[in-house]
Every structure is written in C-alpha cells, then in structure tokens.
Amino acid sequence: WKIEIERLKHKSLNIFGFQNKLIKGYLRSILISSLSFFVGGLNGLFIFLLCAFTAKSLLEVINYIEHYGLVRVEGEKVMPRHSWNSNSVMSSIYLYNVTRHSAHHEKPYLKFWELDAYQNAPMMPYGYLSMLYMTIFTPFFFQKIMSRKLAEWDKLFASDEEKKIIKAQF
C-alpha cells in the first residue's frame, strides 16, 4: 500500500482514484467472486476460492524454488546469478518461459516469448514440474539435491561479498 501511495503521489494522482493498482485489484477480486457466486451459488464461490488458493500456493512454491538458498547483497542490483533457471523444453512450454527466470529479473519489460535462456546462469537440476513435485511431496530430497547445487553456486556464481554473507550464516 505504501509503495502504491508513493507511486501515485509522485505522479500527482488521487490515491483513491482508479489509477490505484491495489484498489483495481481488490475490485476485480470482488467482481470475480461475485460472478462466481451468481453463476454457481455457494458451490461456485467455493470452487473459485479453492482454485485461487491453489494457484496462489503453487505460485509461492515456484517462487521458493526459483530463489532457494541464493543470497544477494542488500541494495545490489538483481543479476542473472540470483535466481535458478531451467532449460527444460516442457517446463518452458507449459509455464510460458518462467524457466528463464534470470532474464525475467534482468529485463522485466520483455514479453515472455522474448526472454532468452541464459547458459551462464544457475540451473535447476530438473525441470520446474519435477522440482515442484519434489518440493511439495519430498522436501527432504529437494533439500538434499539443492544443497549440492548451492555448493556449486557458491563456487561458480557468488561474489566475494555474497560469500561473506554465506559464511556468516553458518
């Protein structure tokens, strides 16, 4: 809310106007929830809320996987080394190139089909869907596999300052 208010004040816009992205988002949520209720009654509303909860949960798990264990110096620009990527063709097709996560952070203005695969960025050991299932159903196995990848990241990608942060954590 604070960030949005600052954005609107900077542009000399009304904080309660329709340019407020949060208000628009809340209104859309109310509208879709209402439509779900009017079309399907309580069952329709319940199914919509269940779908929304599931989608948000999966998004958070994917976000967790994409940044698992990586460190960055506070205030430093996000670089390609600060997120896990995958060159899995199936994951790229099904997830609209979210697999090219470093490119998304480096060039957030690009459309998903314009994102490039970075060969010199940290790579997940498997595709997104495999990593997702592993994280949800076998978190111990996920952590075991990723601990090896993190050791590799420390050697190949971490800056000297990031190595100091890592050392201070243990």
How would you name each of these model-derived features?
Residues 24-36:
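Core segments of transmembrane alpha-helices
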Residues 36-39, 51-54:
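Short, conserved, surface-exposed binding loops centered on an aromatic residue
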